[in-house]
């Protein structure tokens, strides 16, 4: 993937850039793997906003991605197409299995049209192949990793994401996450070799607010510029938060929200580096 920069023909175009899509080989998705997707606009079943800054955007169709590839062990597949997916930052690859079935997977870096992909313990260690962690050599770069055996891929699924297999100890594997966190995962969990493609996605300059609106992202307004009726930080002459610590629009203290008693904390060997907020 490369990035194409626009000429500054308008203020919105100045500095903006877009992916060149050279790796995409087909513009229309596989009909049997497409489902309707209804935009929620950040609302729940009661119609109340539960996630702010969402709404609008272009209509999308959901592509069904295979995050559980257990049932295709020993069945080889050929990469028919690399496609664009509007619902994620990564590209997706359409696989044609030898038994006639078609499925989508996340497209790893350097996976090309016509390549062969395999699943199971007998698969080679090359990008796109899916194996259990116990069958992957230490030091290998992997992505789309399960948290629990058979639970489907949960980690490292966005563009450019990758995890390194550091060690194996007993029944657990030590993984270095994209955040720098080192975590224990059961060796029976599956992972895909390689890193997710489209790594240049993070370098795209959107250029104007309208391009974010096309993606369904609404403006983020700071509480300090609101009125007192709208936010605890609102009001006052000039920029002032009233001398209180940062809070949400509902008055709840801002900061870290993870519970110190969470059961899965015992699987974290080393935490990611963060700028701690008091």
Swiss-Prot record:
Summary of the function given for this chain in its UniProt record: One of the primary rRNA binding proteins. Required for association of the 30S and 50S subunits to form the 70S ribosome, for tRNA binding and peptide bond formation. It has been suggested to have peptidyltransferase activity; this is somewhat controversial. Makes several contacts with the 16S rRNA in the 70S ribosome.
Organism: Streptomyces coelicolor (strain ATCC BAA-471 / A3(2) / M145)
PANTHER family membership: LARGE RIBOSOMAL SUBUNIT PROTEIN UL2M, RIBOSOMAL PROTEIN L2
Assembly and interaction partners: Part of the 50S ribosomal subunit. Forms a bridge to the 30S subunit in the 70S ribosome.
Record's protein name: Large ribosomal subunit protein uL2
Region annotated Disordered, chain positions: 26-57, 225-278
Pfam families assigned to the protein according to its UniProt record, in alphabetical order: Ribosomal_L2, Ribosomal_L2_C
Keywords: Ribonucleoprotein, Ribosomal protein, RNA-binding, rRNA-binding
Record field: compositional bias (Basic residues): 258-278
NCBIfam families xrefs: rplB_bact (TIGR01171)
Family classification: Belongs to the universal ribosomal protein uL2 family.
SMART domains on file: Ribosomal_L2, Ribosomal_L2_C
Superkingdom of origin: Bacteria
Gene Ontology biological-process annotations: cytoplasmic translation; translation
Encoding gene per record: rplB
Single GO cellular component term: large ribosomal subunit
């Amino acid at each position: 993937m490369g990035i194409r920069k626009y000429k500054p023909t308008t203020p919105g175009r100045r500095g903006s850039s877009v992916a060149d899509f050279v790796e995409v080989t087909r513009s229309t998705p596989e009909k049997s793997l497409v489902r309707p997707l209804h935009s929620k606009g950040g609302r729940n079943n009661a119609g109340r906003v539960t996630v702010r800054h969402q709404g609008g955007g272009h209509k999308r169709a959901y592509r069904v991605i295979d995050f559980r590839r257990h049932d295709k062990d020993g069945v080889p597949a050929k990469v028919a197409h690399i496609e664009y997916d509007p619902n994620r930052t990564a590209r997706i690859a359409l696989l044609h299995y030898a038994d006639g079935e078609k499925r989508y997977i996340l497209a790893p870096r350097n996976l090309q049209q016509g390549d062969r992909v395999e699943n199971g313990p007998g698969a080679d260690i090359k990008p796109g192949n899916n194996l259990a962690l116990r069958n992957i050599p230490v030091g290998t770069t992997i992505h789309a990793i399960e948290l629990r055996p058979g639970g489907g891929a949960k980690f490292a699924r966005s563009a450019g994401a990758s995890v390194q297999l550091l060690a194996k100890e007993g029944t657990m594997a030590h993984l270095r996450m994209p955040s720098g966190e080192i975590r224990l995962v059961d060796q029976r969990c599956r992972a895909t070799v390689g890193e997710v493609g489209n790594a240049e996605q993070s370098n795209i300059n959107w250029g104007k607010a309208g391009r974010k609106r096309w993606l369904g992202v609404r403006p983020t307004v700071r509480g300090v510029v609101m009125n007192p009726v709208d936010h605890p930080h609102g009001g006052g002459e000039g920029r002032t938060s009233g001398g209180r610590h940062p809070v949400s629009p509902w008055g709840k203290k801002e900061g870290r929200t993870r519970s110190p008693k969470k059961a899965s904390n015992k699987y974290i060997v080393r935490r990611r580096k963060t700028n701690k907020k008091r």
